[in-house]
């Protein structure tokens, strides 16, 4: 996955935060608050584990995408940019 795709996803999430697009799932998550979003990240992580063990490649990919999306929403709420995570990963590769 290109980091460009991830950056675009994060930009869309930030736009939803700023513009509160009606009917947006991201806006609905934000309205429920940080604790709810954090629980969704945990739920999606569990679904990734289950999919990896018993549901096949396609389902696994779908669940990973869900996890990344929800994690990015939580990151946006926390004020953490993808670049911050990229830098931490680079630091760990030394």
Curated annotation (Swiss-Prot):
InterPro entries xref list: HisE, PRib-ATP_PPHydrolase-like
EC top class named in words: hydrolase
Signal peptide: none
Keywords, sorted A to Z: Amino-acid biosynthesis, ATP-binding, Cytoplasm, Histidine biosynthesis, Hydrolase, Nucleotide-binding
Reactions it catalyzes: 1-(5-phospho-beta-D-ribosyl)-ATP + H2O = 1-(5-phospho-beta-D-ribosyl)-5'-AMP + diphosphate + H(+)
Pfam families: PRA-PH
GO molecular function annotations of the record: ATP binding; phosphoribosyl-ATP diphosphatase activity
Cellular-component GO terms for this entry: cytoplasm
UniProt-annotated location(s): Cytoplasm
Pathway(s): Amino-acid biosynthesis; L-histidine biosynthesis; L-histidine from 5-phospho-alpha-D-ribose 1-diphosphate: step 2/9
Superkingdom to which the source organism belongs: Archaea
GO biological process terms, semicolon-separated: L-histidine biosynthetic process
Primary localization: cytoplasm
EC number from the UniProt entry: 3.6.1.31
HAMAP family: HisE (MF_01020)
Listed NCBIfam families: histidine_hisI
Family of this protein: Belongs to the PRA-PH family.
Protein's UniProt name: Phosphoribosyl-ATP pyrophosphatase
Organism name: Sulfurisphaera tokodaii (strain DSM 16993 / JCM 10545 / NBRC 100140 / 7)
